[in-house]
Amino acid sequence: MSVGLGSSGTGVSDAWGRLVLTVGFLAVAAGTVVAWQTPATAYEVSIYAATPLPFWIGASIGFLSAAVVTLRSCRDRVAGLAVVLGLVTTVTIGALPVVRSYRFYGRADPMSHLGWATEMLAGRMSFGDVFYPGGHSTTALLTDAMGVPIERGMLLVAALYFALYVVFIPLIAKALSGNRELTVIAAFSGFMVLPVNQISNGLFFHTYSMAMWFFPVFLYALVKHIRSEPAVDSITDAVMSDLADGPILDAVGAWNVVLAVLGVTLILIHPQVALNVIILLGTLVVLHAVVCRWFDLFVSDLRPVYGVFVFIALCWLVWIFQFDQVFSVGERVAVSTYEAILGTAEAGESVETRAESAQSVDASIAELFVKLFLVPSVYIALGFLMFVYTLWRSFQDADKRHLSADVDPLSRSVVTYFGYAGLVLGPFFIAHFMGPISHLFFRHYGFGMMFAIVLGAAAIHRIGVVIPEGWMKAAKPLALGLLAVALALSLLTVFTSPYIYNATHHVNDQHIDGFDTAIEHRAEDIQWSGIRNGPGREFDALVPGTVRQNRPDVIGGASTYNESELQSLLSGASDEVMYLPVSQIDVDREVIAYREVRYSEESLRRIGAQPGVHHVQSNGGFDLYYVTPRANGSDPAGVSD
């Protein structure tokens, strides 16, 4: 997998490399044009299968061209162009919902965020009404400036955040060591999009996910700051320097200011990610102030982060105490952890539930682990080994001020810092693995993978350095093969699909327009049902003033969860009339993605044939049924054809 095994002495000409990259760029461009000209016209249960084959061929050629060029040489400008090619290819794949002109992407939380962004754009909701307004306000601004629909604006904003991740992962490695080979390895590691796990994050408008994608920008600034030359030694010196000599920016340092701005930005995108950052900075403060200075366990000439830690922590406290939900989430974490310690609650309930669901469709846990977590696990292991190796070398060096020349002392200290930060963040993340909130653990897993990617890339680079020169010729094809396998395994799961026994988060025109019409013409006192889930998210997105806490009572508590409950509803067992919306999303999800484990295709297709079930609305991808109790022979009312 190492793309840094080559050297500038391999004899490859710039002309040859540029020719290969030209082919790669043209292939990616041609594939993207084909995908752009083939927009989605109906619900797509798999974005992989629905996207035209020429796009995937072009993307494969793009990655192959970039990998071949960087394997030959990582130390010239052509290698930089190869990284750009890989970056463009990765961003294009991540932005496929935009390229394919999806109406919207994201079935759960993103639908609620769509409603909030719409409210903010219309002026019915203010910036301070939302716990995490950063993404919504950016969307409102972008939508208003570009004149695009709000759904389109949200897709563009989500793609923009993802692009920041792809760009800044290699920049972190470059800031860490300045080594071009390590930078290239980190770039290709970032192309694998390892933070996505399809349990609690993804490539859609999800505020935690977007903050997670933004975090590498902060991490890059943090590395640049702690490796920079301090102008002063303390905050007191900074103030005195300002009074005596010049502007406070010169005294405090530009990177301190950048970190403060980025920290506040993270708070506004999602305060939970900002809390992770505060814990990270707090760990660095302890390491610098206590471990390094008092115990002298390892050398650190790195610049401290005292001021920015205090500033971001204070801003975080001021922001979160305006909202009640932070207390409820904190209480759930504390209670779940306490119950798990006492043995009254099981850890990983969300994981257990998903495992049972996977087994119900004949999917093994081993299969899902390979598809979702094999490559990330390799990087986690490599990152941990890199931390242990770096710490061991620091202890082994008798003269801590003159470390071995094979690794830059400052880079070694940064790696050690990150390793210790991971050890501190680990228990905090594991606390979220307890009880019914275990799904939150996989949010933090994505955050932690940012460190694993950088440290894992450093470990791969170290392996490449110690490989004997005589083995290089055989190692390069092996590295190319491992890279191809890792990219394929990883990129096949950046979107949900039947490949991982799930359906894509595509929300098509027929679904939104169908619900919009049904909601507009509804009778407000009639209860809504649903297939597996009710229409709560659709109400969030489409009904002005609706948020999750203020949904109408008629849209909750009446959904069917399996075929027997559906048949009970259709047979008139309920004592009141019901609206039953069924979209193509429901049918394809249950039949194709979930292998009819809860609902059979026949039962879903024959809903309208049941006595007392009236088919009152259809648009080719959405159907609305009016279900009457058998004792009530009333005609359909409340929704027109």
Could you say what each language-model-derived stretch is?
Residues 45-50, 75-213, 442-447, 504:
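Active-site lumenal/periplasmic loops and adjacent helix-entry segments of GT-C-fold
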Residues 86-93, 140, 144, 158-247, ...:
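Membrane-embedded helix bundles of polyisoprenyl
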